[in-house]
Swiss-Prot record:
<dbReference type="GO" id="GO:0031522">
    <property type="term" value="C:cell envelope Sec protein transport complex"/>
</dbReference>
<keyword id="KW-0811">Translocation</keyword>
<keyword id="KW-0067">ATP-binding</keyword>
<feature type="binding site">
    <location>
        <position position="87"/>
    </location>
    <ligand>
        <name>ATP</name>
    </ligand>
</feature>
<keyword id="KW-0547">Nucleotide-binding</keyword>
<feature type="binding site">
    <location>
        <position position="941"/>
    </location>
    <ligand>
        <name>Zn(2+)</name>
    </ligand>
</feature>
<dbReference type="InterPro" id="IPR011130">
    <property type="entry name" value="SecA_preprotein_X-link_dom"/>
</dbReference>
<dbReference type="Pfam" id="PF07517">
    <property type="entry name" value="SecA_DEAD"/>
</dbReference>
<keyword id="KW-0479">Metal-binding</keyword>
<dbReference type="InterPro" id="IPR014018">
    <property type="entry name" value="SecA_motor_DEAD"/>
</dbReference>
<dbReference type="InterPro" id="IPR027417">
    <property type="entry name" value="P-loop_NTPase"/>
</dbReference>
<dbReference type="GO" id="GO:0043952">
    <property type="term" value="P:protein transport by the Sec complex"/>
</dbReference>
<dbReference type="GO" id="GO:0017038">
    <property type="term" value="P:protein import"/>
</dbReference>
<dbReference type="GO" id="GO:0006605">
    <property type="term" value="P:protein targeting"/>
</dbReference>
<dbReference type="InterPro" id="IPR044722">
    <property type="entry name" value="SecA_SF2_C"/>
</dbReference>
<dbReference type="InterPro" id="IPR014001">
    <property type="entry name" value="Helicase_ATP-bd"/>
</dbReference>
<keyword id="KW-1278">Translocase</keyword>
Length: 946
């Protein structure tokens, strides 16, 4: 109460911040006449002037006012668009490294040019992040006209570019690209072996468009570069055949937590099925040998009970393709991890692809936190302001609209069943279509969009493609005639390619568009249709300039007329009179785009995004949600009580309840879900930060190594430290000579480096100390390496040292990632022992990292001591420069130490092998027993270093 009064009296913190920008806005406006008087050449020359001022000691903040005035003038001359005052404020928010919340149609794309230009003056590169390739290409080409006019270069990063093209794009002053491309380029760069092969040049400043989608919705999604493991498709198919045998009483499903678990009866049934199929080892399902089987049973259960076809994924071209729950878009190339994707493939009877091993990974949370300055734009961020600040230290600033919003957001209509709800939606669509009002129906899944499409088809409507000129001609003809044509388009993951065109024409009179969630986000829906879309499409192939000009004028007249029709498509509804009062009155509902939501999403933000498609730039509009007690949100969060209440109220079939209280109750349910999801993301980030800290150490180490011409000091230090650790292990400090494990030390030295070092004889010498023993071993190792340098030459050995060090580091880092994944999966169980899983994970992950570092010293030392260089005149088969190449039979990574040939001898008669002389072994298969007699597989013994 007091807070509300204070806000009314003094204004909110947001109001005060907006007010603080007004002085700079006034200064920019005051410069406008002066800048407008400049010639094109003089305006372009200001870029060099600003750079000179920066070099002389001025800051970017000092240059903000003249730089913004320059960009505004350049936009007027190139695009015919002038930045509004509120857009200048948006640009200032972005420059300060915060989030500008700007409503749909307020020109976020144009706003970004202000902060991009100003920060690009520093010469360190500015990255603009979009949600798909289409928007990246569109915005780079569109806004690139401003940058080019001012003498700045623009690059675009999209799927399918080679490294050379990517390097050129990143070298530009301003680079546009998708979040996926930026993240994967970073991971790929950190798998390169030469600095000149890397494509990115640092992380100075990024502006993230649709920042809520990328930093909130996709925050939990890790970017993973992986390589295939061994093929277990038959195993997945076998496991899948067991699931239909289970009854609902055999497992418990928790939809809120998205988890499923076998009951006691279910376990017994599965045990019997596994035993009969020969897949059960030992006596019980929960014996240690069956841990993997239990995991895959659980994944198969999840695939069948928690994941729905056409909602969570679709099947296309013999593949299971994930559907983004927030946008309804296909996530081509993305796969669920830990065997879940294979379980879905087995469920749908498509080809089961091999599981993958993680080679490199990072979450969007950690990738974007690497930038020195991060900013974002979106139409809906206020509901997630706490999360943006807690995780990214980004403040959300709500930018006022240029014109007041005149959209009417009506209360929800709640029906008892889905059938009643769909009937009400159909009736509402028909009423709107009769008055030529365009309608956008938002659905939460492909399945729901197709249910509505079927309903329209059964009621005399025809489905067309708004991206197809023939379909659009029918829509335009009906609009010109002022008669509804009963045509509709569907926009979901199945029709992703035509997304922008379908959305752009959703504002044509009589258009009915069914869209999953926020598909088509980033493309404005303009009342009457899109001039930018129609002109290129309808003038293509017209060569005569006069004919072309006439066509353009006709399109403009069309759109102006269509806009008037839509603006006047008002709805008159009767308001029931109170008892004893006069007859019913009528009230008008505005025209414009009518948004119909077919159900509430878990997040208020997604609902607000849907509403925000209507009422752009002061246009009228209308939005309403139609709900049923069968909807996921209502069902999961207590629809039983509501159903009882509605029954008691005497709600009849087909009737709806409409009340602000219902809206408030739903909002509270959504807030609970949002809070839970925030906690999940925050907790996951704490765990990922552990791996991220280690990732930074490894990636920084790789960069440092690649910068060095010679790593001889590094490998020498590693060699000496390895020897010190080995001697300390077998010859403890202050121990008596009789307590020394001399035999163990000698065997270990021979096993690792293949040298016969007489440590047993040295140990027998009177008065020898452990320091002397260590010094002699170090001397032998150093002399051995010096001999190799003398034999092959310093340049060759420097190359070998660097290659072996980098590739061994990569190989061990990949193995370490697998270990961390395994640790992460089981660490939660520590909570049952009253121990904090996060602290346990930190401690054990640090221990594993230390082990990896020790293993790195050992492996690099072993390889360099054994390395043989193939002379140039001999044929050599170097593996291609790939990240990985998996053996299809064993699943082993053949690229573990790629591009440094250790020159294995040809296979020899096994009987001629001397266990103590590796040079007599010839080529040994990785799965053979090691010829040294240890009893281990070669790949786990001497082959570990070969």
């Amino acid at each position: 109460m007091i807070g509300a009064f204070a806000r009314k009296l003094f204004g909110s913190s947001n109001d005060r911040r907006i007010k603080a920008y007004q002085a700079r806005v006034a200064a920019i406006n005051a410069l406008e006449p002066e800048v407008a008087a400049l010639s094109d050449e003089a305006l372009r020359a200001r870029t060099d002037e600003f750079r000179a001022q920066l070099a002389a000691g001025k800051t970017l903040d000092d240059l903000l006012v003249p730089a913004f005035a320059t960009v505004r003038e350049a936009a007027k001359r190139t695009l015919g668009q002038r930045h509004f005052d509120v857009q200048l404020i948006g640009g200032m928010v972005l420059h300060e490294g915060d989030i500008a919340e700007m409503k749909t149609g307020e020109g976020k794309t144009l706003v970004a040019t202000l902060a991009c230009y100003l920060n690009a003056l520093a010469g360190k590169g500015v990255h603009v992040v979009t949600v798909n390739d289409y928007l990246a290409s569109r915005d780079a080409g569109w806004m690139g006209q401003i940058y080019s006019f001012l003498g700045m270069s623009t690059g675009v990063i999209v799927h399918g570019l080679d490294d050379g093209q990517r390097q050129k794009a990143y070298a530009c002053d301003i680079t546009y690209g998708t979040n996926n491309e930026y993240g994967f380029d970073y991971l790929r760069d950190n798998m390169k072996y030469r600095l000149e092969d890397m494509v990115q040049r640092g992380h100075f400043f990024a502006i993230v468009d649709e920042v809520d989608s990328i930093l909130i919705d996709e925050a939990r999604t890790p970017l993973i570069i992986s390589g295939p493991l061994d093929d277990r498709s038959e195993f997945y198919n076998t496991i899948d055949t067991f699931i239909p045998s289970l009854d609902k009483s055999d497992y418990d499903v928790d939809e809120k937590q998205r988890s499923v678990a076998l009951t006691e009866a279910g376990m017994e049934k599965i045990e019997t099925l596994l035993r009969d199929a020969g897949q059960l080892k030992g006596e019980s399902l929960y014996d240690v040998e069956n841990v993997s089987v239990v995991h895959h049973i659980n994944q198969a259960l999840r695939a069948h009970t928690l994941f729905q076809r056409d909602k969570d994924y679709i099947v296309r071209n013999d593949e299971v393709v994930i559907i983004d729950e927030f946008t309804g878009r296909m996530m081509q190339g993305r796969r669920y991890s830990e065997g879940l994707h294979q379980a879905l493939e087995a469920k749908e009877h498509v080809t089961v692809q091999p599981e993958n091993q993680t080679l490199a990974s990072i979450t969007f949370q950690n990738y974007f936190r690497m930038y020195g300055k991060l900013a974002g734009m979106t139409g809906t961020a206020a509901t997630e302001a706490d999360e943006f600040y807690d995780i990214y230290k980004l403040e959300v600033v709500e930018i006022p609209t240029n014109l007041p919003i005149s959209r009417l957001d009506e209360d929800d209509e709640v029906y008892r069943t889905q059938a009643e709800k769909y009937a009400a939606i159909l009736a509402e669509v028909e009423r709107a279509n009769k008055r030529m009002q365009p309608v956008l129906v938002g659905t939460a899944s492909i399945e729901k969009s197709e249910v509505l499409a079927d309903l329209l088809l059964k009621n005399g409507y025809k489905q067309i493609d708004f991206g197809d000129p023939k379909g659009l001609d029918k829509l335009y003809a009906a609009a010109r005639a002022g008669k509804p044509a009963k045509l509709f388009a569907v926009l979901n993951a199945r029709f992703h390619e035509q997304e922008a065109y379908i959305v752009a024409e959703a504002g044509v009179p009589g258009a009915i568009t069914i869209a999953t969630n926020m598909a088509g986000r980033g493309t404005d829906i303009k009342l009457g249709g899109s001039l930018e879309m129609r002109i290129p499409q309808e003038t293509a192939g017209i060569t005569d300039e006069a004919e072309k000009a006439a066509k353009v004028e006709q399109i403009k007249a069309d759109i102006e007329r269509f806009r008037d029709i839509v603006l006047n498509a008002e709805d008159e509804i009767e308001i029931e009179p109170a008892k004893g009062s006069k007859p019913a009155k009528t009230a008008k509902r505005p025209g414009g785009l009518y948004i119909i939501g077919s159900e509430r999403h878990e997040s208020r933000r997604i609902d607000n995004q849907l509403r925000g498609r209507s009422g752009r730039q002061g246009d009228p509009g209308r939005s309403k949600f139609f709900l049923s007690l069968d909807d996921d949100l209502m069902r999961i969060f207590g629809s039983g009580k509501l159903d009882t209440m509605l029954t008691r109220l005497g709600l009849k079939e087909g009737e709806a309840i409409i009340h602000p209280w219902i809206n408030k109750a739903l909002e509270k349910a959504q807030q609970k879900v949002e809070a839970r999801n925030f906690d999940i993301r925050k907790n996951l980030l704490k765990f990922d930060d552990v791996q991220n800290d280690q990732r930074k150490v490894i990636f920084d180490q790789r960069i440092d190594l690649m910068k060095e011409d010679s790593v001889v000091e590094t490998v020498t230090d590693m060699r000496h430290t390895y020897i010190e650790d080995l001697v300390a292990k077998h010859v403890p400090e202050h121990a008596y000579a009789e307590q020394w494990d001399v035999a163990g030390l000698k065997d270990e030295l021979h096993r690792v480096v293949g040298l016969e070092i007489p440590v047993d004889e040295w140990a027998k010498e009177e008065g020898i100390a452990d320091e002397e023993l260590l010094a002699r071993i170090v001397k032998v190792f150093d002399e051995h390496m010096a001999a190799k340098v003398a034999q092959w030459g310093p340049d060759v050995m420097r190359y070998a040292e660097k290659s072996i060090l980098l590739q061994t580091l990569d190989h061990l880092w990949r193995e370490h990632l697998v270990m961390l994944d395994h640790l992460r999966q089981v660490i939660g169980l520590r909570g049952y022992g009253q121990r904090d899983p996060l602290q346990e994970y930190k401690s054990e992950a640090f221990g594993l990292f230390q082990e990896m570092s020790a293993h790195l010293r050992e492996a690099v030392t072993a390889q360099l001591m054994r390395v043989e260089i193939i002379p140039p005149d001999q044929p050599q088969e170097l593996p291609p420069m790939e990240v990985h190449k998996m053996d299809p039979n064993t699943g082993e990574d053949e690229m573990a130490f790629a591009n440094v040939s250790l020159a294995p001898a040809d296979s020899v008669d096994k009987s001629a092998r001397d266990p103590n002389r590796p040079e007599t072994w010839g080529k040994v298969g990785r799965n053979e027993d090691c010829p040294c007699g240890s009893g281990k597989k070669y790949k786990h013994c001497h082959g570990r270093y070969a």
